[in-house]
A protein has these predicted regions:
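N-terminal signal peptide c-region/cleavage motif recognized by signal peptidases
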Residues: 17-19
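Sec-dependent N-terminal signal peptides
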Residues: 7-14
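Helical cap/lid subdomain of alpha/beta-hydrolase-fold lipid enzymes
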Residues: 162-425
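Bacterial N-terminal signal peptides that target proteins for export
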Residues: 1-7
Length: 425
């Protein structure tokens, strides 16, 4: 066979292979969670939010064809509103606008809804200030994206869709383009992994959320840069990292710490709804087991005496969160952990035994879909305007599903499955 024919055949086969997903090849946009970070944070060590020392984004870009996969960076400890604003302008281009009414009501520390210098250039040929380039300036209804998010990123992308389509619930936000609404069709799908749609009981169980979050950020930094002393992501002077006054103040409703609690999530869900024009998908996971007298896969050194009514962390759960996942917080003076925490105070979200199973950070019950919003088990036929639940991954903790620290290749099949579904929509 002549070489030109061989090449033509090879190209034809490659084209068929690339199009094996069928319907679309829209960009996938990855959105990190609470205490998350972008690709530049640990560039020296090579540690990535998506994949640890492996690379989920890089894998997706070349798996079964060529695809555009965009990795975003938003505030590590910001509210979903603020993170949505950063996400919008980072993708589309322009300077971040948090909204005038929102900024005033949230008492943003700098008093500005358009902080200087927090910009992305949509046109590389017209960039006199040398701003970083926007990720996808063509973004609109004719050029939609697939949003894929982990943990608090799930709340962030839901907020973004709400603002895109319906605008700000406050009305005019000082002219910010994001808050005008009317952008239906810009998002083809939204997929969440281990997202606290109804909050996480970890927020209430640990008491001092700020102290624990700061400690967790330091542990993440140590894991990401072995032998070094890097600045933890939540403490780095990143854009939007501390938009509101008193970020750990329990009365600060414009903060991640509030929205991630069950009560804050309920308030968030009261205005952020499921769009009838978007495909929603969710994945749950857990890394705890019911207590037993002996012989289960839990960490018996951490919890030698167990009660079958409660959940305990598996031996292989990440050390980062294992002390908070079981019946008791270790160490503590009789404070229940996620595997044993309940509360039934009047006027608050009831947290009962159904919340005990968890992945070390988020309760499995909370990962399926926001309470009261449409949800169904995915049966191979996706439905718009409803959460299509893709199932629960047993034995995976909050960081396993990201491939941390060196489990990226074990996590790849999860993302391959998601991509296969999205590209067929």
């Amino acid at each position: 066979m002549p070489s030109c024919i061989k090449i033509s055949c090879a190209l034809a086969l490659l084209g068929a292979f690339q199009n094996s997903y069928a319907a679309n090849n829209y960009p996938i946009v990855l959105v990190h969670g609470f205490l998350g970070f972008g690709p530049e944070q640990y560039k020296e060590s090579g540690f990535k939010y998506w994949g640890g020392f492996d690379d989920i984004a890089g894998h997706l870009r070349s798996h079964r064809g060529r695809h555009q996969v965009l990795v975003t960076t938003v505030a590590a400890i910001g509210s979903s509103w603020d993170r949505s604003a950063e996400l919008y302008y980072q993708i589309k281009g322009g300077c971040v606008d948090y909204g005038s009414v929102h900024s005033a009501s949230a008492q943003h520390a700098d008093g500005e809804h358009r902080p200087p210098g927090q910009c992305w250039a949509a046109d590389p040929a017209n960039n006199p200030n040398n701003y970083p380039l926007a990720l996808y300036p063509a973004w609109d209804a004719a050029h939609p994206v697939h949003l894929v998010a982990h943990s608090q990123g799930g709340q962030t992308i839901r907020c973004l869709i709400e603002l895109l389509e319906n605008g700000s619930p406050h009305g005019d936000e000082g002219g910010g383009d994001l808050y005008a609404g009317g952008k239906s069709g810009w998002v083809a799908s939204a997929t969440t992994l281990a997202a606290p749609h109804d909050g996480t009981s970890l927020h209430d169980a640990i008491g001092n959320f700020g102290l624990v979050a700061t400690d967790l950020a330091s542990r993440i930094a140590a894991m990401a840069s072995p032998g070094a002393q890097p600045t933890p992501p939540a403490l780095a002077p990143a854009a939007g990292a501390s938009r509101a006054t008193g970020v750990w103040n329990t009365e600060n409703y414009d903060s991640a710490q509030y929205e991630m609690g069950p009560d804050g999530a309920k308030q968030f869900n009261s205005w952020v709804k499921t769009s009838p024009r978007v495909y929603y998908f969710s994945i749950a996971n857990y890394a705890t087991e019911p207590g037993a007298p002996c012989c289960n896969n839990t960490d018996r050194l951490l919890a030698p005496f167990q009660d079958a009514r409660f959940q305990y962390p598996r031996q292989d759960m990440a050390p980062l969160t294992k002390p908070y996942a079981g019946e008791w917080i270790i160490p503590s003076f009789g404070r229940h952990g996620m595997g044993g925490y309940t509360q039934s105070d009047p006027g608050r979200v009831v947290v009962d035994a159904g919340w005990f199973r968890n992945d070390g950070v988020v309760n499995t019950l909370s990962m399926r879909a926001p309470a009261g919003q449409p949800v169904r088990d995915y049966d191979g036929t996706p439905l718009r305007g409803s959460w299509n639940f893709l199932g629960t991954y047993a034995g995976l903790d909050h960081f396993d599903i990201l491939g941390w620290p060196r489990k990226g290749k074990l996590a790849y099949p999860i993302y391959d499955r998601i991509a296969a579904i999205l590209y067929r929509l």
